[in-house]
């Protein structure tokens, strides 16, 4: 894996890349509280089969500039800008958690840029809005989002003791906790060990919550046209398994395939990397 810097949609992105420069492009988008490093098992696997795999730190994370806005329309435009910056017409876009929400939005708003879509443990934005209004269970699972609306305090709590709460969140949100070795967790703790390093990541939640309350939702248009794969770790503490219902998903992506991964939780690409790689590469090879 090689570090890479890109300018897209008006800001500088830090990224990791692997694979031949002329290979088909796969763009991998991480979630919270993660970094491009969360794709460390997928980047070499994709490269070994001839893909050019690129995983950026999202806007406001890690080595990427922390500059708003952080609304879904802007974040989807980041994806289109990265595809352009890499000199391509389109890409396979893979996303987990917040990266998956952004990938869904990009597949709606920048249809020409997303030739195939892969989403891991991330609800469709419309489905999440509906569940948050209708489901006591999902509101309970998402109670951390409400806590994140408090100014200043979440940044301080998450960053104190050298990001110890970040480590607890990664382990606590996983079904297979042993993948988070102390050495691995140190990479994430150091990325979020000061309050200012969390300003951008928490702005995703604050902007999304405010826009939902004010009903300023982005207009996504019709269903996703790109072939879509949804991989879902079934022991997800934060998201209802109903989000992985194939019949439900066909409302948003008619050409969808759903694969449920029973022995994994929310951080599925870290908890079950071999299974994720197997399913991803099989589907891409169709």
Each PLM stretch: what is its role?
Residues 1-12:
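N-terminal cap/lid segment of alpha/beta-hydrolase-fold proteins
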Residues 7-9, 19-21, 26, 222-224:
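Short, flexible hinge/linker loops that cap or flank conserved catalytic cores
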Residues 11-13, 52-54, 61-94, 98-260, ...:
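Flexible "cap/lid" subdomain of the alpha/beta-hydrolase fold that forms the substrate-access gate
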Residues 17-63:
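Conserved HGGG/HGGXW glycine-rich cap/lid loop of the alpha/beta-hydrolase fold
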Residues 29, 261-264:
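Short hydrophobic "strand-cap" motifs at the C-terminus of beta-strands
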Residues 35-36, 101, 264-265:
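A short, glycine- and basic residue-enriched loop/turn
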Residues 264-273, 277:
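Catalytic histidine-centered segment of alpha/beta-hydrolase-like enzymes
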């Amino acid at each position: 894996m090689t570090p890479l810097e890109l300018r897209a949609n008006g800001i500088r992105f830090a990224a990791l890349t692997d694979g031949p420069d002329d290979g088909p492009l796969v763009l991998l988008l991480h979630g919270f509280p993660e970094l491009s490093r969360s794709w460390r098992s997928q980047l070499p696997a994709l490269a070994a089969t001839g893909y050019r795999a690129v995983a950026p730190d999202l806007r406001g994370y890690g080595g990427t500039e922390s500059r708003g806005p952080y609304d879904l329309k802007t974040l989807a435009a980041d994806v289109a800008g990265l595809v352009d910056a890499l000199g391509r017409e389109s890409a396979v876009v893979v996303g987990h958690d917040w990266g998956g929400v952004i990938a869904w939005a990009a597949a709606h708003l920048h249809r020409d840029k997303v030739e195939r879509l892969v989403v891991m443990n991330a609800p469709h934005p419309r489905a999440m809005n509906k569940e948050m209004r209708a489901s006591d269970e999902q509101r309970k699972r998402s109670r951390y989002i409400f806590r994140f609306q408090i100014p200043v305090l979440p940044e301080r709590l998450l960053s104190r003791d050298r990001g110890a709460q970040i480590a607890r969140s990664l382990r606590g949100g996983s079904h297979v906790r042993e993948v988070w070795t102390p050495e691995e967790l140190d990479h994430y703790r150091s990325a979020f060990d000061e309050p200012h390093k969390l300003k951008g990541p928490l702005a995703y939640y604050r902007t999304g919550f405010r826009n939902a309350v004010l009903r300023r939702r982005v207009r996504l248009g019709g269903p996703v046209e790109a072939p879509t794969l949804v991989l879902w770790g079934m022991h997800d503490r934060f998201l209802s398994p109903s989000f992985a219902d194939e019949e439900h998903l066909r409302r948003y992506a008619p050409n969808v395939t759903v694969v449920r991964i029973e022995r994994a939780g929310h951080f599925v690409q870290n908890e079950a990397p071999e299974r994720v790689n197997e399913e991803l590469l099989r589907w891409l090879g169709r």
